[in-house]
Amino acid sequence: MTNIRKTHPLLKILNNSLVDLPAPSSLTSWWNFGSLLGVCLAVQILTGLFLAMHYTSDTATAFNSVTHICRDVNYGWILRYLHANGASMFFICLYLHVGRGLYYGSYTYTETWNIGILLLFAVMATAFMGYVLPWGQMSFWGATVITNLLSAIPYIGTDLVQWIWGGFSVDKATLTRFFAFHFLLPFIIAALVMVHLLFLHETGSNNPTGIPSDSDMIPFHPYYTIKDILGLLIMLTALSTLVLFSPDLLGDPDNYTPANPLNTPPHIKPEWYFLFAYAILRSIPNKLGGVLALVLSILILAIVPLLHTSKQQSMMFRPLSQCLFWLLVADLLTLTWIGGQPVEYPYVIIGQAASILYFSIILVLMPITGTMENRLLKW
């Protein structure tokens, strides 16, 4: 008798995606982050759902409702901190996942890659709107500063900003719509994840060597299910440690002060996972130029497949490209540090240098290095 998982219309789909899926035998731990991101999304949706049961999206009561969740709701504090720090874990996994794709040339699967970029933008939008909901000082001023950037768009900018605000400033209407979108987007993200996996399973997974692995495949279960569970345990341990021992480590103290439109915080800055993009935005003195650089800092990923000049897919056997890749990582860490510093000497000039280097590595140095390595190998 045939196993039900291979015949049942619904179970058959799950079986072909999670059990009998042929996977390359050489996948390293860098391939764990896809499943970890799935778990992060599930955790965020579940904790978010329970938080939404107690949260009120009104300027008069939003801050107090978050306080009420932490003080009066059974285990409300752990829900709130799991949700806030879960977002940080989400972005750590996201950036490592994208980094893996860049290092091993997974961007050559263009459909999967482009859906991934779309997912990255969707998660960033969701995180930004979520940061506004507690209605603390940094929530209010962060929302004001970032939405105001759209006013740099010629001709329609000012109208667009007021349309998003639902008035002439960030106020009750803004908070209500941000809550609505923050609730809706994760479900759109979940649907996009399905499409992401659909395209991935059309081609099959890449592997560290970048060489087709059709001749050497193993079933996903039990080999990679066990491997993913190990990664999951490590991530959940890290998240639990963060939530239970130092829940406010990655947050901003200013957000424990209720939003006050009459009092600007000394340093307005986003959450740590947006600091690199914020540093690129600030490094250009012109408003429209800064906004363009901000968008391009992420959108540049879309043209990476076009800039691939090497005859090898992966960087595994390309030491010169490896050096550039790790220089890019160091540069992004520098930008993250600069984004959290005040706008003064020497931080401004360091930020400008790091921003130029960021775009130079991706647009110029990496393609040149790829061609150079081909020549060195006489290809």
Swiss-Prot record:
Cofactor: how bound: Binds 2 heme b groups non-covalently.
User: How does the protein associate with the membrane?
Assistant: Multi-pass membrane protein
Which keywords, in A-to-Z order, does the entry hold?
Electron transport, Heme, Iron, Membrane, Metal-binding, Mitochondrion, Mitochondrion inner membrane, Respiratory chain, Transmembrane, Transmembrane helix, Transport, Ubiquinone
Name the needed cofactors.
Answer: heme b
Q: Subcellular localization, per the record?
A: Mitochondrion inner membrane
Q: Which PROSITE patterns match?
A: CYTB_CTER, CYTB_NTER
**BP-aspect Gene Ontology terms:** mitochondrial electron transport, ubiquinol to cytochrome c
- Positions of transmembrane segments: 33-53, 77-98, 113-133, 178-198, 226-246, 288-308, 320-340, 347-367
- Its Gene Ontology molecular function terms? metal ion binding; ubiquinol-cytochrome-c reductase activity
Which domain of life does the UniProt lineage start with? Eukaryota
Q: Binding residues for a ubiquinone, per the UniProt record?
A: H201
Which parts of the sequence bind heme b b562?
Answer: H83, H182
Give binding positions for heme b b566.
H97, H196
User: What functional role does this protein have?
Assistant: Component of the ubiquinol-cytochrome c reductase complex (complex III or cytochrome b-c1 complex) that is part of the mitochondrial respiratory chain. The b-c1 complex mediates electron transfer from ubiquinol to cytochrome c. Contributes to the generation of a proton gradient across the mitochondrial membrane that is then used for ATP synthesis.
Of which family is this protein a member? Belongs to the cytochrome b family.
Q: What else is known?
A: Heme 1 (or BL or b562) is low-potential and absorbs at about 562 nm, and heme 2 (or BH or b566) is high-potential and absorbs at about 566 nm.
Subunit text:
The cytochrome bc1 complex contains 11 subunits: 3 respiratory subunits (MT-CYB, CYC1 and UQCRFS1), 2 core proteins (UQCRC1 and UQCRC2) and 6 low-molecular weight proteins (UQCRH/QCR6, UQCRB/QCR7, UQCRQ/QCR8, UQCR10/QCR9, UQCR11/QCR10 and a cleavage product of UQCRFS1). This cytochrome bc1 complex then forms a dimer.
Record's protein name: Cytochrome b
